[in-house]
Amino acid sequence: MRRVAVIAGVIGFALGALAAASVFFAWPMPGHGGAVATPNHPSFSEVQWPYPTDEWGKGKAFRCEAADCGVEVNLYVRAKIGFCNCKTGVSDDAELDRLSDFRLMGEKLSVLGPGRQINVAWMKGRSRAYAISGPFQAQNSALAVAFNDRCDAIVATAIVAQDRPAAIEPSVIEFLNSKTVMHWAEVTLGL
């Protein structure tokens, strides 16, 4: 009788450990490469521009906390006056790559797929997702977005604290269409 109880206990323990392991390894974990649902009400707050001034000057920086966006998102937006292809705008991935602020994204980038067309207010452009890797770096990804008004481009870089930036793209594009960003863009572009 005692032997049956010990065997039943061992089997029960093994099944419990198996269930716990499957839950741990199967459920997505935000910030650890799991899928992140698009939040219903993302809330971006303006923060100080963290980068040194370069030929494009300072831009605007915003942060959406994990509680609001499902994962922490740092968004950097700035104008590149006269730098966009005046005839075609941001119409392909090559132009998006030329305009993007890759220096803000990290050391090593890998394209996660082809870019796609986006609209921000009256402007058209493209977005594209990248994986970021480097020594001593947490798993991050980035979303490069560029759109233009004639020869002037607005470039946005979203650094996402997980490996699937496409999940947060709708929230980033929605924020780029907000009054906050559009007012800044109109003033900066002299419209």
Question: What are these model-predicted stretches?
Answer:
Residues 59-60, 70, 87, 136-144, ...:
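Short, surface-exposed coil-to-beta transition loops
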Residues 48-95:
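Secretory pathway targeting signatures of secreted, lumenal, and periplasmic proteins
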Residues 7-28:
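Hydrophobic membrane-insertion alpha-helices, especially the h-region
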Residues 55-57, 69, 122-124, 146-153:
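Short, solvent-exposed coil/turn segments at beta-strand boundaries
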Residues 106-149:
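Signature of long, low-cysteine stretches enriched in small and polar/charged residues
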Residues 150-191:
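Surface-exposed amphipathic alpha-helical segments
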Residues 81-123:
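Structured, soluble extracytoplasmic/luminal domains of envelope-associated proteins
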Residues 26-42:
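Ser/Thr/Pro/Gly-rich low-complexity linker/stalk segments immediately outside membranes or between
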